[in-house]
Amino acid sequence: MASHVDLLTELQLLEKVPTLERLRAAQKRRAQQLKKWAQYEQDLQHRKRKHERKRSTGGRRKKVSFEASVALLEASLRNDAEEVRYFLKNKVSPDLCNEDGLTALHQCCIDNFEEIVKLLLSHGANVNAKDNELWTPLHAAATCGHINLVKILVQYGADLLAVNSDGNMPYDLCEDEPTLDVIETCMAYQGITQEKINEMRVAPEQQMIADIHCMIAAGQDLDWIDAQGATLLHIAGANGYLRAAELLLDHGVRVDVKDWDGWEPLHAAAFWGQMQMAELLVSHGASLSARTSMDEMPIDLCEEEEFKVLLLELKHKHDVIMKSQLRHKSSLSRRTSSAGSRGKVVRRASLSDRTNLYRKEYEGEAILWQRSAAEDQRTSTYNGDIRETRTDQENKDPNPRLEKPVLLSEFPTKIPRGELDMPVENGLRAPVSAYQYALANGDVWKVHEVPDYSMAYGNPGVADATPPWSSYKEQSPQTLLELKRQRAAAKLLSHPFLSTHLGSSMARTGESSSEGKAPLIGGRTSPYSSNGTSVYYTVTSGDPPLLKFKAPIEEMEEKVHGCCRIS
C-alpha cells in the first residue's frame, strides 16, 4: 500500500486528469485496501490459535505466593478457623504482625472472633502483644466493649495496667458499663491501688530518665538518632515526657534536629497533642515556622482546635518578644557606635547596680562640693597678691580666645556694707573671693585670692560695691590671655594716677545704667574715663595700660582735681 506522501502526490496529479481516469484510480486504491485488511485478519487469527495451543499444552503453574504473616492475618480477618488451624499446625507463628505491629490476636479482638481468639491463645499467642502505638489485645477488646473476650484475655494473664502511647490503660478506654465493671472487678481482685496505677503511668518516663542519666554518666551523645532519624527529644515530645524533656534541654540538646521526614520535636508534640510539651519546646527556642519535607508547620499537624489556638498564641508571643529584642539590640548598637570601637562590652545592669552607681556619683559630687567650700573658706582669710597656678598643658593652645567677652561697664561698683572692714573715704574695697577658671585648651587656673584695692580718688558718694571680679565667677572657661588682661586691669585699679579715671567712670556707671556700654576689654580701644581719655594696654604683657590723651594734660588734670575732694 502506498504511503501517505505518495497518496498526496497522486492526488495532485489526479486533479488534472479527466473524470474517468480518476474513477479508475479510486477503484484501484480501494481494491488494495481490501486486500491489505484481509491479510491483517488472517494474521490475527493465526496468532490467536498459536496462543491457545500454548495454554493447552503448557499446564497450570503457580505464579503468586504470600508471606505467612499475610496469609495468617487474611485468614483471621475472614474468620476462617480451619485455615488458621492449618497455618498453626504448619508451624506458622501466631505472633506474626503487619507493618503496623498488628497481630492476628489484635484483629480477632477487634472483630469479636471468639473461636479464633481461643485457637490463637491455645497455640501460644502473646496475650500482651503491642502494636506500634503500644495497644494490647485487651485495649482493643475493652474499647470495643467485647466483654466475653475481656474475660478470656484476663484468664490468660492479660496486663490490666498496660499503658499505650497515649498513657491510657484498658479501663480508661472502656465505655461499656458491664465491660468496665468486669475490668474493675479484676483489678480489685488483683489488689491494684491508685498508687500503683500512678506508678505504672509514669513508669515509661522514669525508665527513659534512668536511661538518660546512664548516657550522661557514660559521656554519650544525647543527640543520638535511631533508624528513623528520631532523637530522644522526639520521643519525649511525642509521648509528653516533660521531666525527660527538661533533663535533655538542661544538658543542651538541640531542638531543631529533624528526622527522615523532616519532623522536629515540636512537630511530634503538635501531632500527638502534647500541649505542655509544645510550650516547653517553644520556650527553649523551637521554631513554630519550621516545615517538614511535606511543607507542613506544627500548627498544620494539629487536629484539636484548642491546640491550634494555643500554638497561635505562642507564635504571637514569640513574634512580640523577637521584635522587642530587635529594638533593644538596635538601641544598644546606636549607643555603642558613638563610643567608637574600643572593644567595650555592653551589658544590661540590674536595678541594684544602677542604684549603687548613682549613689557613688552623688557621694563624689558631695565630696567635690565640700572641698570647694573648704578651699573658699581658706582662701578668703588670705590677703595678698594674685597667685596663678597652671597645669602642664597651659601653653598648648597658641591662640587662646575669649569664650565670653565681658564689658568693663558690667563690672559692679558697689560693695555691701557688711563686707567693709573700715569706712570708705576716697576709695573702694573689694572683698576676697576664690574660684577657678577653665581654659579652652583644657588647662585650669586657680585664683587663690583677690587683694584689696583702695581707690585713692574714688567717689565718696558710693556706699557699697560688689567685687569687680564677681561677674567672672560664672564665666567659664577662661584663657591665659584673659587672665593676663584681668591682671593688667587689677594693676590699673591699684595705679595711683589711673585710679582717678576709673573711679569716676565706675561711679557714673552705677548712677546711670541706661547709658551705652563700653567696648570689650579685648578691643583695640577701651574708653575707661568719662573725660575723653582712652586707655591702651598690650595684650601679651602684664604691664600697666598706656594712656592716650585727646586733650592737654593740664585740662585733664583740672577736671580730675575738680571732681575729687580731700577728707
From Swiss-Prot:
This protein's GO CC annotations: cell projection; cytoplasm; nuclear speck; nucleus; perinuclear region of cytoplasm; plasma membrane
Lipid addition sites, S-farnesyl cysteine: 564
UniProt-listed InterPro entries: Ankyrin_rpt (IPR002110), Ankyrin_rpt-contain_sf (IPR036770), Pase-1_reg_su_16AB (IPR017417), PP1_Regulatory_Subunit (IPR051226)
Source species: Homo sapiens
GO biological process terms held by the UniProt record: establishment of endothelial barrier; positive regulation of blood vessel endothelial cell proliferation involved in sprouting angiogenesis; positive regulation of endothelial cell proliferation; regulation of filopodium assembly; regulation of phosphatidylinositol 3-kinase/protein kinase B signal transduction; regulation of sprouting angiogenesis
SMART domains: ANK
Pfam families for the chain: Ank_2
Matching Gene3D superfamilies: Ankyrin repeat-containing domain
Protein name: Protein phosphatase 1 regulatory inhibitor subunit 16B
Lineage, highest ranks first: Eukaryota, Metazoa, Chordata, Craniata, Vertebrata
Biological role stated in the UniProt entry: Regulator of protein phosphatase 1 (PP1) that acts as a positive regulator of pulmonary endothelial cell (EC) barrier function. Involved in the regulation of the PI3K/AKT signaling pathway, angiogenesis and endothelial cell proliferation. Regulates angiogenesis and endothelial cell proliferation through the control of ECE1 dephosphorylation, trafficking and activity. Protects the endothelial barrier from lipopolysaccharide (LPS)-induced vascular leakage. Involved in the regulation of endothelial cell filopodia extension.
Propeptide: 565-567
Molecular function per GO: enzyme inhibitor activity; myosin phosphatase regulator activity; protein phosphatase regulator activity
Lineage top rank: taxon: Eukaryota
Listed Basic and acidic residues bias regions: 385-403
